[in-house]
Amino acid sequence: MKKLLIVSVKAYQKYISPLSPPSCRYKPTCSAYMLTAIEKHGTKGILMGIARILRCHPFVAGGVDPVPEDFSLMRNKNTSKNAEKA
């Protein structure tokens, strides 16, 4: 299951994402976050990725938000508010 999820995200990154302009407000991007979350936390990582996508909208400043070591659906407490520092 984990491999299928990873292949799905990589296919999105290669074939679908290039069709639209970059719009993610976070570093790493939401799709890269999803990949890392799945690699670290298995199928629960998909929930983390979905929560991250729901947080990524024009009304947030964004910033550096790495995948936490422990499973959590909340934004990383160590998140930098300034994405340009990444």
Swiss-Prot record:
Membrane protein topology class: Peripheral membrane protein
Family designation: Belongs to the UPF0161 family.
Compartments it resides in: Cell membrane
Function statement: Could be involved in insertion of integral membrane proteins into the membrane.
Domain of life: Bacteria
Signal peptide: none
Source organism: Streptococcus pyogenes serotype M1
Major place of residence: membrane
Protein name stated in the entry: Putative membrane protein insertion efficiency factor
Pfam assignment, any one: YidD
Keyword Cell membrane: yes
